[in-house]
């Protein structure tokens, strides 16, 4: 009997995921990913394939590409996807004729061309911001600069990925360390990377590593559920309800009634459990007796005196901050903060100015990239800062309006490692509160993407499998759409609600659906809220599991 051919057995497994080609991020049905997601074939011009994982912004990284079929349009190397606010595409690509192209056009030439059966090695020195190419294990090319490597890509913290562009009738097989025979097309020599991992046809350059989970740095937050969780519960309407099952004592919660028209209630540790405010309304804080929601060691208790125990089904999104607030004097006025630096979350309370602007210390030790803001007294809408919009723009989570831009009245200047600014447009607001996050790779991601209006929508790389995703169109009047992993335990994730309204849950609404991936999410719906053709859309996402340890749904 004949055994299974060795090239059909890859070392990729849940303990050490290798990069592959993304079968859900090709640019058209004419681009086909096959052979264990390592081969790409294009039957039309400009067939595109991306690697599934981002190239880390530190270290040295290596992969190989076998040219199966060639055309005048073959390009391979690394590329970051086009983004709404940038002109052009960030890339370093080798064309089949040996010319090397970057963001601004041709960079130079490799001094050789490639033909079918050639193998091109690609080395990315992230520390130096350089790319190298090797042909059939020969001498390396010149060092090609990566344009603006490590730039703040709104799609995630990892900007560049392996990339192939092919014309009609072209094909290539990649090896990220899984198969040095390229699906039986070469006799394997099984060279290892710098850590003794993988199998490559040619010797791996000194210090270079395979794009696989074992080689990636440990995430700052290995277990996101120690800092953030969604939880479902059923209200009782008659008695206080104990909700347990969290791995931490929460300090901030957004509670949504899934079955009836109802506000989206917010509770936090600084104001206390008897103080409720609704994120979808410009109303003042409401005092609930005996309490609305009281945080416990592994959850919370909701009373009959609040809006979060009306006998219906609920979901609560819960974050851990730092417990009772402590003084912070980093700003121009005193702030009281409850901060969790490990997970990048801070609750900030202060007293507003009567003129001009003030600065507030936030305690994160990194610039916050997203926050909710509201005064206690009501009468003023909630406001949102998002890094993709900048300091002269804002959105409001209590309505569906497009972003206000070109106005510095709210924030005035961008936040720093220590402070954020409360602008001159917010005078005489008395007690104010911020819920602010900074980005923690592998745990939280705040960015933007461009919709395409069809069910083969964009893939957004966050670096983790999401537990919670909130999406909002920047340019158009559209609702804030919320997805989570407890109301959507499988793909398609199409049980949604809107943060800015009082409506109940939309079930099985495929026009708004997304897929949760091991490293991000993909838009499957065609609605304007999440995927308007050409629309600029921001997102906020928190993790169920970092990519290094994730398994997709």
Q: Would you name each region that the model predicts?
A:
Residues 74-80:
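Active-site region of the double-stranded beta-helix
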Residues 1-60, 66-71, 82-553:
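Surface-exposed molecular-recognition determinants
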């Amino acid at each position: 009997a004949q055994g299974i051919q060795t090239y059909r057995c890859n070392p990729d497994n849940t303990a050490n995921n290798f990069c592959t080609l993304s079968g859900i991020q090709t640019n058209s049905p004419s681009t086909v990913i096959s052979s264990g997601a390592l081969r790409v074939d294009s039957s039309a011009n400009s067939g595109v394939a991306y690697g599934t994982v981002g190239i880390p912004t530190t270290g040295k990284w290596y992969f190989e590409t076998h040219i199966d079929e060639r055309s005048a349009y073959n390009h391979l190397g690394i590329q970051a996807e086009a983004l709404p606010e940038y002109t052009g595409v960030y890339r370093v690509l080798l064309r089949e004729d040996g010319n090397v192209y970057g963001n601004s056009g041709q960079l130079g030439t490799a001094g050789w061309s490639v033909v079918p059966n050639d193998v091109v090695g690609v080395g990315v020195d992230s520390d130096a911001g350089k790319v190298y190419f090797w042909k059939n294990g020969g001498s390396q090319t010149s060092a090609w600069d990566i344009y603006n490597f490590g730039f703040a890509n709104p799609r995630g913290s990892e900007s560049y990925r392996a990339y192939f562009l092919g014309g009609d009738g072209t094909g290539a097989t990649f090896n990220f360390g899984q198969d040095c025979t390229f699906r039986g097309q070469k006799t394997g020599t099984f060279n290892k990377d710098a850590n003794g991992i993988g199998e490559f046809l040619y010797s791996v350059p000194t210090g270079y590593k395979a794009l696989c989970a074992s080689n990636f740095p440990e995430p700052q937050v290995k277990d996101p559920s120690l800092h953030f969780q969604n939880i479902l519960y059923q209200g009782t309407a008659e008695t206080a309800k104990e909700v347990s099952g969290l791995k931490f004592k929460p300090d901030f919660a957004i509670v949504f009634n899934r079955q009836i028209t109802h506000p989206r209630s917010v509770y936090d540790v600084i104001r206390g459990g008897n103080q409720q405010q609704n994120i979808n309304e410009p109303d003042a804080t409401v005092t609930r007796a005996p309490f609305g929601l009281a945080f416990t060691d592994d959850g919370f208790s909701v009373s009959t005196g609040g809006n979060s125990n009306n006998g219906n089904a609920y979901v609560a999104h819960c974050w851990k901050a730092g417990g009772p607030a402590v003084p912070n004097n980093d700003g121009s006025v005193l702030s009281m903060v409850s901060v969790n630096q490990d997970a990048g979350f801070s609750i900030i309370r202060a007293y507003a100015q009567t003129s001009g602007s003030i600065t507030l210390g936030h305690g994160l030790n990194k610039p916050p990239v997203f926050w909710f803001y509201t005064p206690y007294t009501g009468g003023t809408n909630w406001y949102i800062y998002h890094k993709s919009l900048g300091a002269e723009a804002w959105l409001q989570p209590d309505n569906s309006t497009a972003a206000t831009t070109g106005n510095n009245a709210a924030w005035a200047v961008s936040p720093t490692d220590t402070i954020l600014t409360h602008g001159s447009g917010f005078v005489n607001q008395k007690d104010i509160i911020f819920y602010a996050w900074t980005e923690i790779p592998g745990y939280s991601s705040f960015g933007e993407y461009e919709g395409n209006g069809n069910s083969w929508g964009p893939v957004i790389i966050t670096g983790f499998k999401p537990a919670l995703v909130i999406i909002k169109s920047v340019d158009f009047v559209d609702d804030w759409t919320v997805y989570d992993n407890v109301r959507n335990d499988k793909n398609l994730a199409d049980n949604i609600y809107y943060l800015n309204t009082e409506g109940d849950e939309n079930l099985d609404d495929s026009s708004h659906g997304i897929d949760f991936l091991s490293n991000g999410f993909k838009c499957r719906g065609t609605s304007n809220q999440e995927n308007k053709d050409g629309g600029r859309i921001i997102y906020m996402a928190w993790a169920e599991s970092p990519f290094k340890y994730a398994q997709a749904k």
